[in-house]
């Protein structure tokens, strides 16, 4: 059998879509994962679907498809995870800013002391 026919039969059986539907979704996503935006290097894009209803949501790379599955396909948990990551990024940025400000203050104090010596020597 033709590989395209085999894939079409699988997509119809598993997800209720045709290979033309799959290709239209892929084209609408630019051939990349709907989450990370990366083009799949070794494998094709996976059909992501709601396991309870069977509703096809889009096409994902294998890593993203597995990742949302590990979060139980629960958008609330995924949003919490995103907030957690963003908060830690802000903490890292704040620490970097504090470190830079400490260096700026050191340089400022050195310059003030130099200016005092220069003015005092005049």
Predicted segment positions?
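Contiguous alpha-helical segments
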Residues: 1-46, 51-105, 109, 114
